[in-house]
Amino acid sequence: MTNGKYAARKLKKDRQQRRWSDSEYARRERGLGKKSDPLEGAPQGRGIVLEKVGIEAKQPNSAIRKCVRVQLIKNGKQVTAFCPGDGAISFIDEHDEVTIAGIGGAKGRAMGDLSGVNYKVEKVNGVSLIELVRGNAEKPVR
């Protein structure tokens, strides 16, 4: 490192070069998060339900979390989405159109005891899943 009255340019250049050693900085600058994200940086996405799946919770919990496999409309990628709410899975059928969003885990990843599930179902055929579970709305017949 250089010291001195006129060393600012060298210090700045060295700092800019060293930043690339930080993996988070490098990923952010190269846009790798958006590249690997099935939603391509969007907050929500629409998809078609392929199948219902039950995913076992990680230790020490013991449960089968109800999820669905969804094929996104925008790019054809398949993701697993969690169905929040008591009995929510009963309102979702195969070939329904669902809106999914991030599940809200740390650093945009999985949440709690659900490994590999980064998304949750928000709407089914344009109607909020929470409204369906509460009984405030009815699922439209397509």
Curated annotation (Swiss-Prot):
Ranges annotated as biased composition (Basic residues): 7-16
GO cellular component: cytosolic small ribosomal subunit; ribosome
Bias (Basic and acidic residues): 17-38
Region of interest (Disordered), ranges: 1-44
This protein's UniProt keywords: Ribonucleoprotein, Ribosomal protein, RNA-binding, rRNA-binding
GO biological process, one term: translation
One Pfam entry name: Ribosom_S12_S23
GO molecular function, one term: structural constituent of ribosome
Family (UniProt): Belongs to the universal ribosomal protein uS12 family.
Quaternary structure annotation from Swiss-Prot or TrEMBL: Part of the 30S ribosomal subunit.
Primary role: With S4 and S5 plays an important role in translational accuracy. Located at the interface of the 30S and 50S subunits.
NCBIfam families per UniProt: PRK04211.1, uS12_E_A
Name by which UniProt lists this protein: Small ribosomal subunit protein uS12
Gene source species: Halobacterium salinarum (strain ATCC 700922 / JCM 11081 / NRC-1)
GN (gene name): rps12
